[in-house]
Amino acid sequence: MQNLYVNVTSLDSRAVDKFALSEEIMMEHAAIALERTIRERFVLGSSILIVCGSGNNGADGLALARLLEESYDVILHLPFGASSPLAKLQLKRLDALGIKSERLPKNADVIVDALFGSGLSRPLDSATVKILEALNALQGFKIACDVPSGLYADGTLDFHTFKANLTITMGALKRGMFSDAAKDIVGEIVVADLGIHHTHYEVPSQWHLLEASDLRLPLRTTATAHKGTYGHVAIVCGEKAGAAVIAGSASLRFGAGLVTLLSTENVPLPYELMLSHSLPDNTTAIALGM
């Protein structure tokens, strides 16, 4: 299973303190991860629209523009200026290269959203909404830097959230990207390392993403094993039995030896499930199928 985080501010601070990284080093690696993905997927000379916010997520985008400017047709759009120290530094570097902010084009091969990262906590203002509407209307391949702008840490999202084909999230997976609401706007998800491998960057989390390897069925190697060897699951039925029947069938498929549904009614069941009006004495696990 993989760790999920509501935000990674504390992980960034830990990387600075424990591994002597700097915010600028981590930002450069974030930009390199974006650059590498674009170089792997798009031919040289493609038009790359990079839309940057005024903070550090925008600074990632500014650094990306610097890395791509010689090989691609980079179109930089910086609607709100640069406010964070690192954004100002990245903008100074672009100024030295002669790269200036331009108006939004009518189209581009690639659209990079670097407006807001996972720290967004306020409603989107009308100016931002207008920009996101314009970006979503473009036909190019859409990449979100860290998270799609408009997606909040709790997994809720603004109606105008950037609809990405690919999200390159920085450092670690964010919990909000796996909410039901986010499924249609994050696209493919790639985690970018920020100067150290993610196993060093991460710390234990109370939130996890299950993987197929976590769902291994019991290994039945004993020749004398029988249905009583692998536990007895009791599932309490609600007013409607459908959920309990589905849970019971899933329990058997996952390896439970016996499954009994508890109900005050005589519920019709598949032959492999048992029905009882009281809790069996040999129950080893209880679930609510409601």
Where are the predicted features?
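Short secondary-structure transition/capping segments
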Residues: 88-89, 155-156, 270-272
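Short gly/ser/thr-rich secondary-structure transition/capping motifs
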Residues: 94-100, 148-153, 214-219, 272-274
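Structural alpha-helical scaffold elements that stabilize or flank donor/cofactor-binding regions
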Residues: 104, 160-161, 279-280
